[in-house]
Amino acid sequence: MPVRPARCYKRIKGPPYTREEYIHGAPMIQIPKFDMGTTSAAARTAFTMTAKLVVEERGQIRMQALEAARQMASKYLTKYVGDANYYLRLNVVPHHVLRENRMLAMAGADRLQEGMRLAFGSPAGRAARVEPGQVLFYAEFKPEHLPHIKEALRRAASKLPLPTRIVIEPKGNGGNKTVT
């Protein structure tokens, strides 16, 4: 069955539905990697700048959108910066199980199926619930790679259903922030 559009799941309605021991048939999390690039702490000491992709609205982001954004950013950085010159981390995990009340659509149907009101639905996917100001992607890099990092995060943001902003700052405790 085809996947419903993201607009069906963008808004948060009701409490989170995360208890897998009570949910039969909950889909697995389909994000294979959360850390990309140079992942060793010793090699990351050479990076002096950080960039964050910060969400600006409350909502839900499906795991397919998170995976598409991760792949887009990772492929761009691998091609133009190289795996040894950046560290990228996806900070959110899609724990919330999405439900779908499936309706039958038949060829030649002259009536619409109404179904049951307030039907609970069966598991159809997963989403991460995010709040304003929450960091979706975190990157560490050298200053000479700043344009490529910004472009990679911009491309990742284009795959997400919520508005975001990119925050650039020096690595360490605080410092001057540059919001773009």
Curated annotation (Swiss-Prot):
Record bears the keyword Ribosomal protein: yes
Record-linked InterPro entries: Ribosomal_uL16, Ribosomal_uL16_arc, Ribosomal_uL16_CS_euk_arc, Ribosomal_uL16_dom, Ribosomal_uL16_euk_arch, Ribosomal_uL16_sf
Alphabetic keyword roster: Ribonucleoprotein, Ribosomal protein
Pfam families in the record: Ribosomal_L16 (PF00252)
Keyword Lipid metabolism recorded: no
Record family assignment: Belongs to the universal ribosomal protein uL16 family.
Name of the protein in question: Large ribosomal subunit protein uL16
